[in-house]
């Protein structure tokens, strides 16, 4: 629970009651909240004064117990990163597009925090050197699955296949009215994030 101190208070009463420095779950009631990124870390709730969002957070927080496995969505090769050379700053594309603020400058290359990274994939799609690549699933695994789908479609007598890539947030719409409007040759392929598809996949 995040509560800001008033101007006259040296420290918020809520802060004074804290017995540890790290938490798995945070309900930030500040407006604006302490964290401003578009994609907040898992377990961080910021209703921003929205009563419905606050109700959802209060309902979900007690259910978030136990452990979960967070995948590592990326591979990073700092040797080919074009972020900087000899003290001269270069490419900042991944820094500019990451909605989770998981990427930071580390001098002549960037570094990615695997705990903040949520697999949006825009960094891998926009990286000019391939220093950041998407790893969950890998391009090879994705293309292998797509080939299997296409072969099965062809063997069943299908023609002129149309691949429709969509993310998990669109799954409900695809299964409903939106999917019903697709032509017969459309084959939906669900991804963690559409941004994870780069030119290497489009041109394969």
Where would I find each of the regions flagged by the language model?
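Iron-sulfur cluster-binding cysteine motifs and their immediate structural context
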Residues: 74, 89-113, 118, 122-140
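Short helix-loop-beta junction
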Residues: 177-187
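A contiguous, basic/glycine-rich beta-loop/short-helix subdomain that forms a polymer-engagement track
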Residues: 134-155
């Amino acid at each position: 629970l995040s509560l800001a101190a008033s101007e006259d208070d040296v420290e918020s009463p809520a802060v004074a009651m804290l017995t540890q420095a790290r938490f798995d779950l945070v309900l930030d009631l500040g407006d604006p909240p302490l964290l401003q990124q578009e994609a907040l870390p898992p377990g961080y709730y910021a209703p921003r004064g929205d009563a419905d969002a606050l109700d959802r957070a209060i309902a979900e927080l007690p259910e978030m117990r136990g452990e979960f496995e967070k995948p590592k969505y990326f591979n990073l090769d700092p040797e080919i990163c074009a972020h900087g050379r000899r003290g001269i700053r270069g490419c900042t594309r991944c820094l500019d597009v990451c909605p989770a603020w998981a990427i930071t400058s580390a001098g002549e290359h960037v570094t990615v925090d695997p705990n903040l990274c949520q697999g949006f994939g825009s960094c891998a799609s926009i990286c000019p050197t391939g220093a950041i690549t998407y790893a969950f699933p890998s391009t090879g695994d994705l293309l292998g699955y797509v080939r299997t789908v296409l072969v099965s479609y062809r063997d069943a007598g299908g023609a002129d296949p149309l691949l429709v890539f969509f993310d998990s947030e669109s799954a409900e719409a695809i299964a409903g009215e939106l999917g019903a409007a697709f032509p017969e040759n459309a084959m939906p392929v669900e991804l963690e994030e559409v941004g994870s598809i780069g030119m290497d996949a489009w041109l394969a």
